[in-house]
Amino acid sequence: KNEMLFYIGKKTCSTYDLNSAIKTNNYNVVNILLANIKARMFKNEINKEDILKLMAAREWAGESDKWTKASGLYSAIVKGYTEIVAAWMETADVIASHYENDKDVVRELLSLSRNNAVCSLHIASFKKMSKQVIDVYLNAAIRLALQHGFTFDEIVEQFTRDFDGKPFSHVVNNGDDIHMGLWLKIFKIVVGENENYLKDVMMQLEEKNNEGKSVISQANGNPVLKELFWKAVDEFNFPQEELNRLKQYRSL
């Protein structure tokens, strides 16, 4: 309680304050600090660069610290702090709306899910991560991108960077079930949010390799990927015509 009163009394917050509160999973203090950033933004007390720096809440400790230079959001995702990720993404939404004609602000906010060049949903961390935190992050991140006019190609580019630079066809070709599952989740959310992107998603799913073999046929050749793919398709909220078209591949 005293700690909360201390932060409420502070006129400004530093990147260290927010990073520290996130790392200790102190949801109440995180909320106070995020509210502080929004209030100062609306009063024009801080500029865009400072807002993004505060939202990054990067670790600044010595090299021995595991989270050196990691953003607060990255730490929260990897540690599975679902409530904090949700609160951070809600604040990101408010900031993006404040700078509504500036797509780079959205790009910058979404890039904070990465630890420098390393993605948040890194394969090494993913197996230990809470699936709930991934759902919360992806749903909020994709919604944010779509609300601010990202094209399908821009969404793919954004999340390819999140996934170690691996596009959908590449992960299927490599038998990478972890990243394939993440891509299928993204396709489901994108179409659920905006059916205009259905055609783009279908093109990704039906893409053919040099030998004329479709991505789905490749997935069918791997028992793990096959099970993962058709389980995801069964959960897709696609129009019946497209679902029927996909299901023709089931026996191939």
Predicted regions and their residues:
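Ankyrin-repeat intra-repeat helix-capping/turn positions
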Residues: 25, 80, 128-129, 175-178, ...
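Ankyrin repeat domain, specifically the short helix-to-loop turn at the C-terminus of the second helix
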Residues: 2-11, 32-58, 86-108, 136-154, ...
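Ankyrin-repeat boundary/"N-cap" motif
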Residues: 10-20, 50-75, 105-125, 154-173, ...
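Terminal export signals
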Residues: 4-9, 13, 20, 26-32, ...
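Leucine-rich solenoid repeat scaffolds
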Residues: 205-252
